[in-house]
Structures are given as C-alpha cells and as structure tokens.
Amino acid sequence: MTGNNQTLILEFLLLGLPIPSEYHLLFYALFLAMYLTIILGNLLIIVLVRLDSHLHMPMYLFLSNLSFSDLCFSSVTMPKLLQNMQSQVPSISYTGCLTQLYFFMVFGDMESFLLVVMAYDRYVAICFPLRYTTIMSTKFCASLVLLLWMLTMTHALLHTLLIARLSFCEKNVILHFFCDISALLKLSCSDIYVNELMIYILGGLIIIIPFLLIVMSYVRIFFSILKFPSIQDIYKVFSTCGSHLSVVTLFYGTIFGIYLCPSGNNSTVKEIAMAMMYTVVTPMLNPFIYSLRNRDMKRALIRVICTKKISL
C-alpha cells in the first residue's frame, strides 16, 4: 500500500553475516554449536542454584538471573539467524522485528544492571562482612531483582514504541543479523531526532552509569584489601571477584568497542562482529568463567550428581 511516496513495510530482509558461500555450512554448524553451549551452560547454572541449598545466597541469586538473561538474550537472535541461514529469503515480519527489538533490549539491559548489582554484592561482602546478611537480605535482593526487571521492560518498551511510530519507505533491507535499533533508524524516512536523543540520554543511564558504578565498587574493594593482614585473604578476594571482572570486561569491552573504535568503510562489518561478541560469545563463555573459577559451583555440581546417583 502506497501514499505520499511511502510504502507500508510488512517485512524486513536481514542480510545477516557477510559469510562466503563456501563457508556457509561451516559457520552454520559453528553457530548452532555455540547456541547449544549457551543453552546447556546457562541452564546448568540455573538448575544448580535451584537445587543446591548451599547456593541459596544473594550472589548466586544474581548469578542465576544473569544466566537466565544470557540464555534469553541469545535466544532472541540466534534461532532467527540459524533459520535465515537456511532460507532463500532471510526475512522477518514487521511485528516480529519490533518484538525482537523489545526483548533484545530487555535482556541486554538486564545483563548490564545485574553486573552492577553483583559488583555491589561483592563490595558489601568484602568491605562490610559483619553486616552482609543484614544489608543483602533475601527480601531486599528479591525486591531488587524485581525492580530491575521492571526498569528494563519499561526502557525497552519506550524505545520500541518510538520505533513503531516511525515510517519506513521503500528500503527494507537491514544490514545486520537481527533488528538492531541503529539499523532500523537508518531505514526510516521519518524524523528520528527524538529517537536519537532518547538513545543518548537513556544509553548513558543503562551503559555508562552502571559501568562507572562497577568501577567505583572495585576501587573501594581494592583499597579495602590493602588493609588485609595476609596474602591468603587477598588471594581469596581476587579469586572471588575474578570471575565477575572477566564477565564485565567481556560485556562492556565489546559494547564500548562499537562506539569508541574509529569507524571506517567496514564499520557495518565491525558492528556485526561486535554484536556477535556480546550476544553470542559472552553468554557462551559466562558459564565457563563462573563454574571453572568458582569452588562453590564445582562442589554444588558434585553434590547434585552424587545425590542423583544415590537416588537411582
């Protein structure tokens, strides 16, 4: 349907990844293996935290929510990517595109918020150990997680509604493997000033401020451990915080890389590669980082396996 030189767009074409045809099958198998690893790894953490009573602590409540967020974050984009890699016409409906955008932002925002909360949890545990159980009570932590989900849903809904009000002309080709908000803005023939303004303002609240809060938490932790009497205590703190710092580096490093690295003619390829890092690679590595460097997780896995063997 046309009018005023505009076309009602019913679907978009996702060009996906610039993969040569001879490597298409290889990359399909690679992405499928990565997605299955994401599902199994993050489900394992969720199940362990649920089944093992020794992990019923704030730190692991946040970790299980992070694993759930990682699992859903990848599931928003990966199934459609795999489907389109096997399709002659890699399309997504207009409604499906907005739905994908909404949930992508929900789970992406949630990961950013949870990393802040986990940093705060470590800060309280190390700097105020005697008051830890009082400050990080079960009720407080559950309420905090619920609040974070509400904030992320509200933020994602705002951007989705702002995109929904835009008009899209004849161009419907998205140079990405999912409905990225920046790619959609490039296709719009409407005034996108409000959209860009909200991205800059709220982007700082969702990305910059959480990152600064994490840095502040670890600065306080660093100065606190300088007062520790023994090397063993310092090593224990570093081993406890090391997993979280690794995840923070992976997540924020790739996101900042999109905006801080100089853009050239291959800026679209760079954005796609970076997006693949924080939507696929990071969620895949997180379970390994937390399980391989965490004694509690290893012991919980052994206890659950032994319990199942005894019950059989």
Curated annotation (Swiss-Prot):
User: Keywords, A to Z?
Assistant: Cell membrane, Disulfide bond, G-protein coupled receptor, Glycoprotein, Membrane, Olfaction, Receptor, Sensory transduction, Transducer, Transmembrane, Transmembrane helix
Q: Where in the cell is it found?
A: Cell membrane
* Organs and tissues of expression: Olfactory epithelium.
What is the official name of this protein in its record? Olfactory receptor 1500
Write down the PROSITE patterns for this protein, in alphabetical order.
G_PROTEIN_RECEP_F1_1 (PS00237), G_PROTEIN_RECEP_F1_2 (PS50262)
Q: Which residues lie on this side of the membrane: Cytoplasmic?
A: 50-57, 121-139, 220-236, 293-312
The protein's matches in Gene3D superfamilies, at most eight in alphabetical order, are given as:
Rhodopsin 7-helix transmembrane proteins
Q: What family does this chain come from, according to its entry?
A: Belongs to the G-protein coupled receptor 1 family.
Q: Which SUPFAM superfamilies match?
A: Family A G protein-coupled receptor-like (SSF81321)
